[in-house]
Amino acid sequence: VGTLGIYFTQNGGSYQDGTARINSRMLTDIIMQQIHRDVRQEYEPNWKRRSMWDKSYVEARVPEVPTTLIELMSHQNLADMKYGLDPGFRFTVGRAIYKGLARFMAERKGRELVIQPLPVNNFSIKRTRKDHYQLSWAPTPDPLEPTAMPSKYIIMERTGDDLGFHKIGETKGTHFDINVTDDEIHSFQIIAANAGGTAFPSETLALREAPDGSKPILIVNGFTRISGPGNFSAGGEAGFDAEADFGVPYIKDISFTGYQTEFRRSAGESFGRSGQNYATTVIAGNTFDYPAVHGAAAAAMGKGFVSASASAVEKGDVKLSDYPVVDLILGKQRSTVVGTGKRGVEYRAFPEPLRKALRRYSDKGGDLIITGQYAASDVTGMRSQNGDRDFAEQVLGVSGAESDMTRRGTFRDNRGQSYDYSNTLNEKNYIVESPDVLTAAENAHTTTLATMADGTKTVGIINNRGKSKGQVALLTIPLESITDAKERARIFNTMFKAVTTNK
């Protein structure tokens, strides 16, 4: 594992404009330093900085500008690719290369270096009064780059079925007030900016004003996971078991060619071989744009809604008690470890601050709708934390969960209505490979909400916690993975009525 750099100086030659070719060596050195430093601090303390080669590679020789070739990894072995397939690692490396280029240009031209910010966090929308809302967020400091702080924020809006976003304002603060005079779904992104450029957009949150002006429900986006596929090593076999856990691309992926087919370490050069079935397929990932999808299901019932990131709930910026019903989006959120685990466990479905906030809310009568593929197994499985199992049994109403590798992609509700969900790789919806099959807790008063198509495996339950406490609907088929909008609205309606009636 490690990074190699290649440049070409032509024994002290110059480019056509007179620039000395030694600048290519300087560029290579700066970028390699940046990659080495950032990867070591963020992912792998033992990441190696390998050689720099002054060689006549055509890609280094032909361009008439300072040029570098970066061989990020020594070769595509399993240890390398645990990082190489991870979208977060790719972002860190890509940002390191960008920062190295910016440093080179700043030094060469004698300019102040300012690095573009990271996306904002703790994004939330609050209804301040009828038709009036406030967007709030927080900047994300970059521990690797002190210059990357925002100096302003750009507010982007999408209305209804618009295909894209348009700018509606700028601010130097971390709040923005808006007025809504219709019952359309309005979606928003915040883009941090400074003299160095703009950050990636924030997650997308949404709102809708109910026609009758009634109190909105709260949609919480807890699906922040991006990751490479699951991996294993046991009994002479190793590799990526992407059929069991494909991982989650950032928005979409165009690099996947096919599932691994050769897992035997003894297979020599064939070890790690994969198919080519998906070489021309765009694979959908986490779009960070699901509150509007859930909101459309709520709107079909005539409901208004606001939305917030789970981190805003965890920080206390959003009070769940202000809302009669909370809809928690978990998608494919799951405890995840990258590489050797320097970053620890990330993307827990119910991190402790969120778990405690949900429990307080439910204990005081708040009703919960929770959808997520791993919503049960992540708090009952091997990576569960102290307090997780109590939460699972007493709030969710489950004591355990197993994966179901069904190929049908169909489930049905307690009325016998069928629903199709995304269970194959495609360019529209992320894949749901193995939804949790639920085991109800012995002391919980649960009823079945949904089963797989065969009717024998429970994937949804209603936990009746008693008259003084809130009701909980749990579905391990993510709502946004249901392919038909009318079907999404139907199952949301079923869950909503189940938790808000018979109290």
Regions found by a protein language model. Name each.
Residues 1-29, 53-76:
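Active-site microenvironments of hydrolase-like enzyme catalytic domains
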Residues 177-198:
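Beta-strand-rich modules
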Residues 55-61, 436-437, 454-468:
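Short, surface-exposed beta-strand/loop micro-motifs that present aromatic residues
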Residues 45-111, 476-479:
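Active-site-adjacent mobile loop/cap segments within catalytic or ligand-binding domains
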Residues 166-173:
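Short beta-strand segments within Ig-like beta-sandwich modules, predominantly Fibronectin type-III
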Residues 203-325, 329, 496-503:
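Aromatic-Pro/Gly-enriched surface loop or interdomain linker
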Residues 332-446, 450-453, 487-491:
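A glycine-rich, often tryptophan-bearing local segment used as a flexible ligand/cofactor-contacting loop or short
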Residues 103-147, 197-214:
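Pro/Thr/Ser/Gly-rich low-complexity, intrinsically disordered linker/stalk tracts
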